[in-house]
Curated annotation (Swiss-Prot):
Belongs to the glycosyl hydrolase 31 family. InterPro entries: Gal_mutarotase_sf_dom (IPR011013), Glyco_hydro_31_C (IPR048395), Glyco_hydro_31_N_dom (IPR025887), Glyco_hydro_31_TIM (IPR000322), Glyco_hydro_b (IPR013780), Glycoside_hydrolase_SF (IPR017853). It is found in: Secreted. GO terms for biological process: cell wall organization; glucan catabolic process. GO terms for cellular component: extracellular region. It catalyses: Hydrolysis of terminal, non-reducing (1->4)-linked alpha-D-glucose residues with release of alpha-D-glucose; Hydrolysis of terminal, non-reducing beta-D-glucosyl residues with release of beta-D-glucose. This is Alpha/beta-glucosidase agdC. It comes from Emericella nidulans (strain FGSC A4 / ATCC 38163 / CBS 112.46 / NRRL 194 / M139) (Aspergillus nidulans).
Length: 894
């Protein structure tokens, strides 16, 4: 019985599981259905073990509960959990469940999905009401629900088109033979293919062409292997192998890929809107030696006439890598503040990195954290320690009730606008959480000493070059101080928390905190974690949070919880401004708080190519549209050609940043003439399209409809596009077809059966569902085509403008690409670009028909902006100067 299970000791459970695990999984008895209660919008039932327990990877839980709810006509919620509700469930505080409208499935409306089940053994199926297509079917494979292992398998059509299940660096369309997607967030240097990376998104899209597209989301944060393969009978399947938690499924009816993404956003949350300036170009590097080198980069971009919106600083600014500190010799506060002021005076911005790990030594962030008791502790009450950049470290417990105040206070102190580093946005890293020390890491202090943590800072430069354009008080002062000796700070000995109780002794009584007695370090089932043991390179999974939850269950939530609290801390600093926070680690729903950069990639053509698929997965499936890769690659030495190509591609990432690693060749865009030219051209196009991007981005934050689109999202009935992940739509109007091979000046681009226009010439190209070879593509160019039927608003004066502030002052030109019927339409959204709450805006639709351009919509923002020109694409490109104010409805004849 489940109640009896809670009274057994860990040793007894382990011995029992191993003694009884004689049966293969295929012989597990499954469950039978009893006590079914039909409801207007679903049903409830009890599931009871249908035979002898098999106890293969834990102890079978005898009594389960089944609930189904037709939340809306397009969404079905199916939940299977233990009857006693002691098994861990993702807390509502971390993932708020959608509010279900009682009228969403009124009697006159018919749900688009159907739930059916078999009683003994229990299985269930989900089908599409309109065509009886079976979408999910567990028949023939018994449900296994054990203390540390949950298994559920669904059959699939042959050769299915599956997408999602991130984070990974595999093709967008998932492999379907002998393929395993492991979800266990880890520090994944070089983002190797076929492995678990920084995020966990148990959401997939199943695209079946004209039969429709649906989505399946499993709300479960435990480690898992999701296996896709064929069985011995050649039946295609997808199988969940989970280390715990419950089966909390949301099924989305679609029927289009865009519909599925919108429906997922209704559950996971709408993405956060970013400030307009955040869509500009960003520069960073790990390894800038001092604040003067950072300033020199700013100057060099200006000299090269490459627009730079935001300058970043990696952990180099810290005192021996300790968060919320400055290196007083290399990044003195007054000089950092002077640079920030210099940037702000020129409408540029500044960002630094913050890691979660706090140095276990005498420093303010550590001392204040101790006072509030916010750090993770072991079961004996002592502080849990790992080893990260500053050496021995402790980790904030995001579940602790004091942590929010602690984190907000640290930001308020260090990033104080009047006395600290007045950052404009935030970068958070290492929040899987990363830990350099392998389990069991019994002596993190010794590990840090042996592995040179923190690393020696660079020697203080005695004679940094003067900085043209900077004021005299900012210029370097000559110094012969070459003292870079390590400050070995005193390790503070902390007693166990007084009165601390081993969490896990009282986690019954339906509190959903996780079963007692589990093997939290070495569970019987081994997921394919590329780091090895669950606790390798991260926090130990047998430690507990202040609310009683085990790290074993919540590991995949750590980065997203840091994201949420960091966004709150940024809001506290600037309550009326939209925060921009970029994170490495994510879980489902993280897009409501943050954007994501795709991690520590490599300067290779393989990583360049796969960055497109990664970007599309996050933006179109996982609802994290502020996404992009490190342009030119993070680790390894880039090349001039690769960096040129990447500069042009990255300009069509929503998040556009150049970043690379200490010790590698410098790769700022001005380092090579050809790369500088590529960057200037690409940024000019990007900035001309910035309001088009901003409009599309805003729409996703309001409706959930994605704007960065795989081709199958735009042409769902074209079977030729299901595997294309080297082309994409930038908004629904612009097709981007980058060169993806080294040494090539051509690209084999697929054009669906539609009308397209070359962005550069305006000439038409009639797609016929075939591959067309585009030739003579220089290293500084990227092929772009506008889809027929679209109007694209572009800023008229973007060329040569250094900041997005300048861009916002220029007027508009409408690029009109008539469809096959001769008509076209497009949208434009303008607000103040930064306020959290907008009270005034221009939100309009442009239409073109029979030679007339019209505008209508919302005009509550007082503005002098106007449409100054139009360009009508076609065999004979037409350009006209017009005057169409954006202060009210109107139109002009061309």
């Amino acid at each position: 019985m489940a109640g009896t299970l809670l009274s057994w000791t860990p040793l007894a459970l382990a011995l029992m599981a191993r003694a009884l695990s004689q049966l293969p999984l295929t012989d597990c008895p499954g469950y039978r259905v009893i006590n079914v209660e039909e409801r207007p919008r679903g049903l409830t039932a009890d599931l009871t073990l249908a035979g002898t327990p098999c106890n293969v990877y834990g102890v079978d839980i005898e009594n389960l509960r089944l609930e189904t709810d037709y939340d809306t006509n397009q969404r079905l919620h199916v939940k299977i959990y233990d009857a006693d509700e002691n098994v861990y469930q993702v807390p509502d505080s971390v993932f708020p469940r959608p509010v279900v409208n009682d009228q969403a499935c009124a009697d006159e409306n018919t749900p688009e999905l159907r739930f059916s089940y078999a009683e003994d053994p229990f299985s269930f199926a989900v089908s599409r009401a309109s065509n009886d297509e079976t979408l999910f079917n567990t028949t023939g494979h018994n449900l296994i629900f054990q203390s540390q292992y949950v298994n559920l398998r669904t059959s699939l059509p042959q050769n299915p088109n599956l997408y999602g299940l991130g984070e990974h660096s595999d093709p967008l369309r998932l492999n379907t033979i002998n393929y395993t997607r492991t979800l266990w967030n880890r520090d994944a240097y070089t983002i190797p293919a076929g492995t678990n990376l920084y995020g966990a998104h148990p959401m997939y899209i199943d695209h079946r062409g004209e039969a429709g597209t649906h989505g399946v989301f499993l709300l479960n944060s435990n480690g898992m292997d999701i296996k896709i393969d064929k069985n011995s009978d050649n039946i295609q399947f997808l199988e969940y192998n989970i280390l715990g938690g419950v089966l909390d499924f949301y099924f989305f009816a679609g029927p289009s890929p865009k519909d599925v993404s919108v429906q997922y956003a209704e559950v996971a949350g709408l993405p956060a809107m970013v400030p307009y300036w955040g869509l500009g170009f960003h520069q960073c590097r790990y390894g800038y030696r001092d604040i003067f080198e950072v300033a020199a980069v700013v100057h060099n971009y200006s000299e090269a006439r490459i627009p730079l919106e935001t300058m970043w600083t990696d952990i180099d600014y810290m005192d021996h890598r300790k968060v919320f500190t400055l290196d007083r010799e290399r990044f003195p506060l007054d000089t950092v503040r002077a640079l920030v002021q210099y940037l702000h005076q020129r409408d540029q911005h500044y960002i630094v990195m913050v890691d979660p790990a706090v140095a276990h030594s005498e420093n303010g962030a550590f001392t204040r954290g101790l006072e509030k008791d916010v750090f993770m502790r072991k079961q004996d009450g002592t502080l849990y320690q790992g080893a990260v950049w500053p050496g021995a470290t402790v980790f904030p417990d995001w579940f602790h009730p004091n942590t929010s105040d602690y984190w907000i206070n640290e930001f308020a102190l260090f990033f104080n606008a009047e006395s600290g580093v007045d950052i404009d946005a935030l970068w958070i890293d290492m929040n899987e959480a990363a830990n350099f020390c392998d389990w069991p890491c019994t002596d993190p202090v010794a590990y840090a000493e042996e592995n040179n943590l923190p690393p020696e800072p660079p020697a203080v430069r005695p004679n940094p070059s003067s900085l043209p354009g900077f004021p005299a008080e900012f210029q370097p002062v000559n110094s012969n101080n070459n003292n870079s000796s390590r400050k070995r700070e005193t390790q503070v000995v902390i007693a166990a928390r007084q009165g601390f109780v081993k969490v896990g002794n009282d986690n019954g009584n339906g509190r959903r905190l996780g079963l007692q007695g589990r093997e939290l370090i070495d569970p019987p089932y081994k997921i394919a974690n590329a780091a090895g043991s669950l606790s390798n390179k991260t926090m130990n999974t047998d430690i507990f949070h202040a609310n009683g939850l085990a790290e074993y269950d919540t590991h995949n939530l750590y980065g997203t919880m840091m994201s949420s609290l960091s966004r709150d801390a940024m809001l506290y600093r600037r309550p009326e401004k939209r925060p921009l926070v970029i994170t490495r680690s994510t879980f489902a729903g993280a897009g409501s708080y943050v954007g994501h950069w795709l991690g520590d990639n490599a300067s290779t053509w393989t990583k360049y190519r796969i960055s497109i698929a990664q970007m599309l997965a996050f933006a179109s499936i996982f609802q994290i549209p502020m996404v992009g890769s490190d342009a030119c690659g993070f680790t390894g030495n880039t090349t001039e050609e690769l960096c040129s190509r990447w500069a042009t591609l990255a300009a069509f990432n929503p998040f556009f940043r150049n970043h690379n690693e200490y010790g590698m060749v410098s790769q700022e865009f001005y380092r090579w003439n050809s790369v500088a030219e590529a960057a200037r051209k690409a940024i000019s196009i990007r900035y001309s399209l910035l309001d088009y991007l901003y409009t599309e981005f805003h729409e996703q934050t309001v409706t959930g409809e994605p704007f960065l689109l795989p081709l199958f999202f735009v042409y769902p009935n074209d079977p030729n596009v299901v595997g294309i992940d080297s082309q994409f739509f930038y908004g629904d109007a612009i097709l981007v077809s980058p060169v993806i091979e080294e040494g090539k000046t051509e690209v084999h681009a697929y054009f669906p059966g539609d009308l397209f226009y070359d962005w550069y010439t305006g000439l038409p190209l009639r797609g016929n569902g075939e591959v067309i070879t585009l030739t003579d593509i220089g290293y500084t160019d990227i092929p772009l085509h506008v889809r027929g039927g679209k109007i694209v608003p572009v800023r008229t004066g973007s060329a040569g403008m250094n900041t997005t502030t300048e861009v916002r002052k220029s007027g508009f030109r409408l690029v009109i690409a008539p469809g096959l019927d001769g008509r076209a339409a497009g949208r434009l959204y303008i607000d103040d670009g930064e306020s959290l709450e907008q009270t005034a805006m221009v939100d309009v639709v442009f239409t073109y028909e029979d030679g007339r351009v019209s505008v209508d919509g919302v005009f509550t923002l007082q503005t002098d902006l106007r449409v100054e020109a139009v360009t009508v694409f076609g065999d004979n490109v037409v350009e006209r100067t017009i005057d169409l104010p954006l202060s009210g409805p109107g139109g002009v004849e061309l």
